[in-house]
């Protein structure tokens, strides 16, 4: 699934590499790791996008190529922390509806309160 099919669309993007970390805000939000062609590899949420971006760069599973491509883009939307699980679940459900499964790097269902 291409990033362009997500509703709502993530508002910002940076390259998924260390030199981009200063461009990521220290705010709550939902994010997507995507290939150069904008294919979704991972959907997540964080109360601090800046910290989460750096954590993912330290995770070999997130930085190494998958059979569906390599994470090149970090798309994100700053979002109210109370509603983060709902937005993440919405995006995951949209992906699941098209592919019948989670994105390749999403292993478990996120909780929704």
List where the protein language model places each region:
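Alpha-helix boundary/capping detector
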Residues: 70, 110-113
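A structural signal for alpha-helix termini and helix-coil/disorder junctions
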Residues: 59, 93-98
């Amino acid at each position: 699934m291409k990033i362009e099919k997500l509703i709502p669309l993530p508002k910002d993007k940076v390259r998924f590499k260390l030199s981009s970390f200063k461009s990521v805000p220290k705010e709550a939000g939902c994010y997507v790791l995507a290939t150069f062609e904008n294919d979704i590899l991972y959907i997540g949420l964080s109360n601090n996008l800046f910290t989460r971006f750096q954590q993912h760069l330290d995770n070999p599973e997130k930085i190494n190529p998958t059979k569906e491509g390599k994470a090149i883009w970090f798309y994100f939307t700053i979002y109210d922390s109370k509603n983060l699980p709902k937005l993440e679940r919405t995006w995951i459900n949209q992906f699941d509806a098209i592919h019948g499964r989670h994105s390749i790097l999403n292993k478990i269902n996120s909780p929704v309160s």
